[in-house]
């Protein structure tokens, strides 16, 4: 019998119930013990909709599920003989549960998707690629709206178009928008400080509203045409451009006719370049699933306004032993947790609880959402193409996995590892004469780059001398592995590496060896990888902590693989360094003035043009800037004129 070691808690406001075991039996999996923990929860559960979380002895979330009737659903986990092996393993690790009641099953489904995304439990199907999708933002908070790429929260005022499958899809569409509709893409501060047109005007990618080369009314017409194009009314736009070109030619205005011709060609090109055509489909997403060799791929097309905005393939994790209809349902809920659902979702198989899924997605969209398995017509042809894509992408993935597995075995042989490494961490430093210094860590596994695990380390300790690569490496490793020891001392979360590669030679290896000795880590393999004297790839020398060093033949497959790993670390480090340097260069003395935030800083810069002009302004001039109060003006004036 389980005796809770702390009082059971029930918070009526949050409708959350938690029960914990008494700690007997330790952390070792125990099926009977886990089932008893669940029974102790069931006795107090309501027959209401809600979400449940299975927790292990450390309090980590093992699984998140939803239920129409919590008592009935959770009871099923106590009948362990009927559970598949995957769920038996989960129950054996369960030492506590958390329950959240909801007002409806649809609400429970939405909450389940949020919690899966937050906790990423090991027994849930997981959408690996949860990076936010790019959108096109048409900003409307200016007299002359601008177009730009956007990711993340929708805080800016304007119209959002998307999702696009990739940054490349957005770039191509933005390029077409600039060529066809001549909309500006510059920042407001750049716009406000122009005295002559920029290069984009010269190459016919902008109408130069910054210097009054187009009226506000005519620019509004361009914006309206761009909106029509993005919302699928491109035929009407083509017709208007064609008619305008004809009128210009009839009026002998051949220069204007040529401009309109080029705009029409740009619009026609972007339409003709689409490999997937979805005439008459409006807004829809198309998903198809392929399974083979223990892996699974879901291919998706994104259609908006009848136009293909790209495709992407997904490889969900933790799918072994999970029915494909359940995988599809879980995928859709997680995918749309961060992306607005369209009116129509086409799938190659009906997901579990399809009607409930459509209801939940409809609640997030504020309108009806249809989930359909088409059997004929254009929709079926489009779905068949997605099915082919899913199969081809999965075959490619399996071939890469086979090659990757072979490389893993050879890597284990080369560095005398017990098993092929499941997690490889690669480290590099980046700085320019000690400025904007940082360390970077990239991670690779059997299935490729683990970009969600990448980390950058801003060098910030006073004792780390700028430009001292060895000291930088010491700081990076001290911070990385001191935290690992604190957060995962038993190494059970899969966040400890099986192999560490360091971009550097003897000095870097010695620095890392000293850190590991200080932290009491004596079982973690690490290797230094240094290029030859001329820095050419192919002449790398490998340095081991015991002092040995060796090279590999230039045509060795493992050498090529290690070069790719090191180059990815270098790419990530350089990119992070450039971003840090750009941020530092973008800082201003105004950042140090009390009461000056981004909005007032922007207002002052737009009004005066430069920080030098702000510094030389009188108190009266400062007070004339929009949005700047007398108190703020006084603070700015006092900052630049400390003696009065």
Curated annotation (Swiss-Prot):
Location in or out of the cell: Cytoplasm
GO molecular function (one): excinuclease ABC activity
This protein's UniProt keywords: Cytoplasm, DNA damage, DNA excision, DNA repair, Excision nuclease, SOS response
Any one GO CC term of the record: cytoplasm
Gene3D superfamilies named among the record's database cross-references: 5' to 3' exonuclease, C-terminal subdomain, GIY-YIG endonuclease, UVR domain, UvrC, RNAse H endonuclease domain
Coiled-coil blocks: none
InterPro entries documented for this protein: GIY-YIG_endonuc, GIY-YIG_endonuc_sf, GIY-YIG_UvrC_Cho, Hlx-hairpin-Hlx_DNA-bd_motif, RuvA_2-like, UVR_dom, UVR_dom_sf, UvrABC_protein_C
Pfam families referenced in this protein's UniProt entry, alphabetically: GIY-YIG, HHH_5, UVR, UvrC_RNaseH, UvrC_RNaseH_dom
Positions of the GIY-YIG domain: 47-125
Gene Ontology biological-process entries: nucleotide-excision repair; SOS response
SMART domains for this protein: GIYc (SM00465), HhH1 (SM00278)
UVR domain boundaries: 235-270
Alphabetized PANTHER family for the sequence: UVRABC SYSTEM PROTEIN C, UVRC/OXIDOREDUCTASE
Stated family: Belongs to the UvrC family.
Quaternary structure (record): Interacts with UvrB in an incision complex.
Function recorded in the entry: The UvrABC repair system catalyzes the recognition and processing of DNA lesions. UvrC both incises the 5' and 3' sides of the lesion. The N-terminal half is responsible for the 3' incision and the C-terminal half is responsible for the 5' incision.
HAMAP family, sorted: UvrC (MF_00203)
Name of the featured protein: UvrABC system protein C
Species: Sphingopyxis alaskensis (strain DSM 13593 / LMG 18877 / RB2256) (Sphingomonas alaskensis)
């Amino acid at each position: 019998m389980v005796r809770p070691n702390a009082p059971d808690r029930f918070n009526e406001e949050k409708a959350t119930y938690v029960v914990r075991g008494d700690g007997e039996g330790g952390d070792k999996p125990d099926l009977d013990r886990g089932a008893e923990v669940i029974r102790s929860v069931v006795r107090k559960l309501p027959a209401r909709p809600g979400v449940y979380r299975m927790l292990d002895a450390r309090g980590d979330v093992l699984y998140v599920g939803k239920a129409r009737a919590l008592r009935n659903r959770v009871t099923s986990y106590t009948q362990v003989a009927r559970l598949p092996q995957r769920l038996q393993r989960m129950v054996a690790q369960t030492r506590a549960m958390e329950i959240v009641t909801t007002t409806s099953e649809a609400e429970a489904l939405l909450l389940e998707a949020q919690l899966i995304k937050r906790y990423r439990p090991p027994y849930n199907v997981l959408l690996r690629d949860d990076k936010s999708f790019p959108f096109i933002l048409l900003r409307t908070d200016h007299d002359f709206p601008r177009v730009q790429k956007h990711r993340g929260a929708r805080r800016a005022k304007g119209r959002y178009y998307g999702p696009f499958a990739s940054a490349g899809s957005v770039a191509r569409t933005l390029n077409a928008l600039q060529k066809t509709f001549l909309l500006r893409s510059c920042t407001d501060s750049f716009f406000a400080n122009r005295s002559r047109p920029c290069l984009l005007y010269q190459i016919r990618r902008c109408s130069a509203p910054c210097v009054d080369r187009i009226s506000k009314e005519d620019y509004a017409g361009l914006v309206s045409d761009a909106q029509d194009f993005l919302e699928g009314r491109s035929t009407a736009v083509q017709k208007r451009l064609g008619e305008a070109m004809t009128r210009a030619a009839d009026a002998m205005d051949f220069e204007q006719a040529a401009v309109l011709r080029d705009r029409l060609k740009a619009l026609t090109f972007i339409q003709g370049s689409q490999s997937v055509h979805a005439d008459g489909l409006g807004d829809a997403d198309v998903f198809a699933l392929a399974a083979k060799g223990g892996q699974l791929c879901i291919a998706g097309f994104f259609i908006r306004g009848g136009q293909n905005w790209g495709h992407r393939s997904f490889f969900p994790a933790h799918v072994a032993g999970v029915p494909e209809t359940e995988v599809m349902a879980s995928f859709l809920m997680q995918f749309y947790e961060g992306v607005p659902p369209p009116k129509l979702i086409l799938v190659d198989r009906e997901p579990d609880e399809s009607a409930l899924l459509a209801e939940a997605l409809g609640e997030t969209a504020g309108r009806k959402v249809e989930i359909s398995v088409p059997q004929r017509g254009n929709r079926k042809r489009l779905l068949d193409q997605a099915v082919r894509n899913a199969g081809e992408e999965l075959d490619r993935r399996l071939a890469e996995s086979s090659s990757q597995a072979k490389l893993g075995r050879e890597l284990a042989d080369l560095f005398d590892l017990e098993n092929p490494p499941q997690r490889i961490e690669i480290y590099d430093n980046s700085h320019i004469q000690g400025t904007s210094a940082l360390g970077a860590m990239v991670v690779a596994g059997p299935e490729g780059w683990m970009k969600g695990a990448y980390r950058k380390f801003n060098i910030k300790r006073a004792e780390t001398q700028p430009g001292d690569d060895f000291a930088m490496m010491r700081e990076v490793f001290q911070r990385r592995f001191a935290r690992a020891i604190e957060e995962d001392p038993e190494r059970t979360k899969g966040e400890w590496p099986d192999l560490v590669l360091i971009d550097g030679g003897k000095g870097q290896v010695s620095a890392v060896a000293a850190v590991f000795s200080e932290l009491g880590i004596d079982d973690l393999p690490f290797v230094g990888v240094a290029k030859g004297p001329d820095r050419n790839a192919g002449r790398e020398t490998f340095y081991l902590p015991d002092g040995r060093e060796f090279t590999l033949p230039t045509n060795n497959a493992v050498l090529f693989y290690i070069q790719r790993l090191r180059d990815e670390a270098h790419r990530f480090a350089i990119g992070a360094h450039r971003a840090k340097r750009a941020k530092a260069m973008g800082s201003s003395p105004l950042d140090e003035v009390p009461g000056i935030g981004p909005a007032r800083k922007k207002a002052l810069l737009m009004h005066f043009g430069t920080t030098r002009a702000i510094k030389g302004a009188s108190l009266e001039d400062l007070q004339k800037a929009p949005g700047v109060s007398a108190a703020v003006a006084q603070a700015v004036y006092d900052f630049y004129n400390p003696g009065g």
